[in-house]
Amino acid sequence: MTDETLTKPTQSQAAKIEQTFGTDGIAPMARPSRTTRFFMAIVAWAEKLNLKYAKFGNPPVYDNATFPWTREIEKAWPEIRTELDRVLLRKNELPAFQDISTDVRTISTDRQWKTFFLIGFGVKSKQNIQACPKTWQAVQKIPHLKTAMFSIFEPGKHLPAHRGPYNGVLRLHLGLIVPEPGEKLAIRVKDQICHWEEGKVLIFDDAYEHEAWNHTDKTRVVLFVDFVKPLKYPARFVNWALMNLAFFTPFIQEGLGNHKEWEKRFYAEAETLRNRPGA
């Protein structure tokens, strides 16, 4: 699933150079408040702890054997794909990622990256879960789950190089719809080119620079999951505290509110269609 294009860095020093600290790689805010600057300093300090106390090191892309539960996720692929197919019947009504999480506008402003959240930042989407119970059952096998959604890349979509805002989580992709030809569809994480495969898991650290593209003429879909990075004490405790504090930040609260409004409209329209005479 991966092609190493350059020599691997050492685990510690190279990771410190390549990973995000604080707000590196994030569009700067105009005149950040004293509170914001204080929080950013804490995040930068926590990220250094996360690198030092990472339980399984800090590779850009992980060996799936590191996480034995990935086999259970892959076994659930046929049921997840069946539920996805039902969701895609209303693909045109699904929100673009930036409609939910407005900070995504720094890397995507079109309608070619759509989402269907089951859980975001630890908050469940009850109606979406009811629509995809087998998918929800599968992701419960992932320890310390934070986010799970269907990530839908339309033909021609290219997500530019960027870094995640914090290195306290890892990202999982399960290939659900992966069109051919494979060489026109990939994700680069640092210096590794990774190719999705249907029914196969890919785990990477989004704190490294990464970009993704779909240069085929068909839609690509993956199950997109964020889970807490396995850490040793004291980083594990600090990370837990920051994750809980982050829930109250304005951009996460805004995202949760945006999703709640979309969900309300989406299922109200579905109910109207069901109640239409002759439906």
Feature-to-residue mapping (PLM):
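Short beta-strand or tight-loop elements
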Residues: 146, 157, 168-172, 208
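A short beta-strand-loop-beta hairpin characteristic of the jelly-roll/cupin
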Residues: 177-198
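Conserved metal-binding segment of the jelly-roll/cupin
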Residues: 194-209
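A short hydrophobic beta-strand segment most commonly corresponding to one strand
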Residues: 171-176, 203, 218-234
